[in-house]
Regions:
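Short amphipathic alpha-helical coupling segments at ligand-binding clamshell hinges
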Residues: 51, 55, 132, 232-251, ...
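Ligand-binding clefts/hinges and TM-proximal coupling segments of bilobed small-molecule sensing domains
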Residues: 22-24, 72, 143-166, 242-277
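Bacterial N-terminal signal peptides
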Residues: 2-12
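Extracytoplasmic small-molecule ligand-binding "clamshell" domains
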Residues: 20-98, 168-172, 258-259
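Periplasmic-binding protein-like
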Residues: 37-38, 108-120, 162-165, 202-245, ...
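Bilobed "Venus flytrap"/periplasmic-binding protein-like clamshell domains
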Residues: 33, 38-42, 46-61, 113-174, ...
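Alpha-to-beta junction loops
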Residues: 64-66, 83-93, 134-135, 177-178, ...
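Acidic, polar ligand-binding/catalytic clefts
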Residues: 57, 61, 66-130, 141-142, ...
């Protein structure tokens, strides 16, 4: 293990680009080492099929380096045991935190209302009377759960734990389980983070509507900016990534749209027009 760790942390002292000359010693300069979950579709998977995998490929291409992953299942301690150990240098998608330094945001999205096609046509807010008494599935501790509590609808909700571990789990993620229960009519409605909801709904085998929650009060927030994450104080590395994100903005947006990620304008809760329009 020590030998492997040492190999991962080696940095060549040979001729490097300007990028390499200004990076902290902990960041490797010939390989983009990404911290990622091996089974968290549509975000990431070991086969490289997730949209964060595709975005990592774009960044590696822009930096002219190879791509390597350090795999760890998402859960408590993910950042500490990935970035914090020095075994990888970049988290592709994060909304920030005390022990992580975010790059500039590269997309903004929102929580969504997911229903079977046509069953709740016209419903765009959580206080809509049509939702009263309906069976609503969501992940415990998320902003929509707080909002439903404020509305006195908590008794109608089915709260799923945020993480599912163990060999007996039937679904790769909790969000996938919720969508499966919606498809099976165990739920009337699901409320999920948009970047996972769109793709999972499309994969469910049942036609579904995915409606971003754009008209809710500012608190609790339903829309969030997503950045990449690096270690604290790695400012040169962050600036290099910001440059790559800016240069490849159109490519990244295409990947997100291909995975049905609801994209919002930077400041307003309005759908983002395609850069190709």
């Amino acid at each position: 293990l020590n030998a492997a760790l040492g190999a991962l942390l080696l940095v060549s002292v040979g001729a490097r680009s300007a990028l390499a000359q200004h990076l902290p010693d902990l960041v490797t300069t010939d390989v983009l080492r990404v911290c990622s979950d091996p089974g968290n579709m549509p975000f990431s998977e070991r086969k490289g099929g997730g949209f964060e995998n595709k975005i990592a490929e774009i960044i590696a291409d822009e930096l002219k380096v190879k791509l390597r992953y350090y795999w760890l299942t998402q859960g408590p301690g993910f950042v500490r045991n990935t970035l914090g150990t020095g075994l990888c240098d970049l988290i592709i998608g994060t909304s920030g935190g005390d022990i992580i330094q975010p790059t500039n945001p590269y997309y903004r999205s929102a929580y969504t209302l997911v229903t079977r096609r046509g069953e709740f046509a016209g419903v765009t807010t959580l206080d809509d009377p049509k939702l009263k008494g309906k069976q609503i599935g969501l992940i415990a501790g998320t902003p929509p759960a707080n909002r439903l509590g404020e509305l006195g609808m908590i008794n109608d909700t089915h709260s799923y734990t945020a993480y599912a571990f163990g060999p007996d789990r039937k679904f790769q993620t909790v969000a996938a389980e919720i969508i499966a229960d919606l498809a099976a009519k165990k739920l009337d409605v699901a409320i999920l983070w948009g970047p996972s909801a769109g793709w999972l709904a499309k994969q469910s085998g049942v036609e579904m509507d995915v409606t971003p929650l754009l008209k809710e009060p500012d608190r609790p927030p339903m829309a969030f900016r997503v950045s990449m994450g690096v270690r604290l104080n790695e400012n040169d590395w962050k600036r290099s990534l910001n440059t790559a994100l800016r240069k490849r903005k159109t490519d990244i947006e295409k990947v997100l749209r291909d995975f049905q990620v609801p994209l919002l304008e930077e400041e307003e809760n309005k759908p983002l027009q395609s850069s190709n329009e």
